[in-house]
Amino acid sequence: MFINRWLFSTNHKDIGTLYLLFGAWAGMVGTALSLLIRAELGQPGTLLGDDQIYNVVVTAHAFVMIFFMVMPIMIGGFGNWLVPLMIGAPDMAFPRMNNMSFWLLPPSFLLLLASSMVEAGAGTGWTVYPPLAGNLAHAGASVDLTIFSLHLAGVSSILGAINFITTIINMKPPAMSQYQTPLFVWSVMITAVLLLLSLPVLAAGITMLLTDRNLNTTFFDPAGGGDPILYQHLFWFFGHPEVYILILPGFGMISHIVTYYSGKKEPFGYMGMVWAMMSIGFLGFIVWAHHMFTVGMDVDTRAYFTSATMIIAIPTGVKVFSWLATLHGGNIKWSPAMMWALGFIFLFTVGGLTGIVLANSSLDIVLHDTYYVVAHFHYVLSMGAVFAIMGGFVHWFPLFSGYTLNDTWAKIHFAIMFVGVNMTFFPQHFLGLSGMPRRYSDYPDAYTMWNTISSMGSFISLTAVMLMVFIIWEAFASKREVLTVDLTTTNLEWLNGCPPPYHTFEEPTYVNLK
């Protein structure tokens, strides 16, 4: 029965497929919103109307891309599909809770869309800072609906995190230690721990904001002894781990892709890679106030957060150089997935370098809330997380579907996307250095040239998205079945065929440990 299979599913592969489809759909919405932003900024003057509607679009773009595209695809899609296969588990630890985690997302998405349809919309930015998000500056239901949307997405992620942690620790073969699980499994487990520790703090913050708006509490209102800076601390204590949540599963996927297409049987420095991810996860919790260098913190506080932020570059560097060392001396296969992985390593490193610049509290005073910050986080997200997703997708698509993509088209798609995202975001560094502020729908004529180039780049990326839809259609229409898979001894997920049967590892797995 269709309903029994897709609505009441308890199968990790089906739920993973649902997550991938939902994430792809949300990605289209998020892309459309980003194109609205770039259309508005393509030339001076107004296109959409006032700044409120512009900021509603910006806010929705952020929420859709983060909570409904990257997280569902990386953690829900790839995580559900691959983690049980990689550790030889028959399914997730809590299969019905797994289904609920997914089905909380469409209602959450619906609430977010509703928030932009009522009143004037939530034009707060994804940070939802009071007093702008208070009931004076944002009267009406919009911000409340956004808060409810975040609550649902948060519950979904917390339940998913519990599920993954339990599965990864508890459902390995008895003889297999944690240090024999693949790096993608590690990355998902560390991501789940970050989610479990950070999301409750966000929930507390937005719940207090909700009561400030509706029940006359004053958590964030100085008139009643509250402090809007408290909200910023609560939000960023979640918000900074969140950005590592978005990239860590990508690290895991890139490790697998680089190892596979270098013809290696293991990544360089496995233990170092695990240590690096754990370090990044830990450090991610003690650097949050680097988002707040302009709110008037003590000089010693700023010095600490500057130093702590820079320390994160060390484990990140360990990962980058280990990927390069994995490539070294390998029999490199120039597949589309490998191109995405190499693009990831290069562009993620560029994004990391601008992050080191922003970590300096003195420089950040000048660069805060300019397009330099936008350029920085889009290099690590739009070219880090997205390139990892694309690399993972073209690498594991034959496993998920049983069909192969057209290699040539996939490489053309990569080339168009590479040109598009770089043309979009590289000029934004220049805009930021010349002082163009974020979150404005219009700008002085002096900024016209780089904005026009940036907007042209975004439309190149759009053609890449449309080409990807065609490539996937072409694969299903042509039905080229998978013939053989290399290196299955060190890539267990391929062991059961392409696609694997509905139920895998129904009997306990026999592991021969070397």
Curated annotation (Swiss-Prot):
Cofactor: binding details: Binds 2 heme A groups non-covalently per subunit. Binds a copper B center.
Enzyme class: translocase
Residues annotated as binding Na(+): E40, G45, S441
Binding site for Mg(2+): H368, D369
Pathway(s) of this molecule: Energy metabolism; oxidative phosphorylation
Posttranslational mods: His-240 and Tyr-244 are involved in the formation of a copper-coordinated covalent cross-link at the active site of the catalytic subunit I.
Topological domain ranges for the Mitochondrial intermembrane compartment: 41-50, 118-140, 213-227, 287-298, 358-370, 434-446
Modified residues (N-formylmethionine): M1
Record-listed heme a3 binding positions: H376
Cross-link (1'-histidyl-3'-tyrosine (His-Tyr)): H240-Y244
GO biological process: aerobic respiration; oxidative phosphorylation; respiratory electron transport chain
Assembly behavior: Component of the cytochrome c oxidase (complex IV, CIV), a multisubunit enzyme composed of 14 subunits. The complex is composed of a catalytic core of 3 subunits MT-CO1, MT-CO2 and MT-CO3, encoded in the mitochondrial DNA, and 11 supernumerary subunits COX4I1 (or COX4I2), COX5A, COX5B, COX6A2 (or COX6A1), COX6B1 (or COX6B2), COX6C, COX7A1 (or COX7A2), COX7B, COX7C, COX8B and NDUFA4, which are encoded in the nuclear genome.
Protein name: Cytochrome c oxidase subunit 1
Species, as recorded: Bos taurus (Bovine)
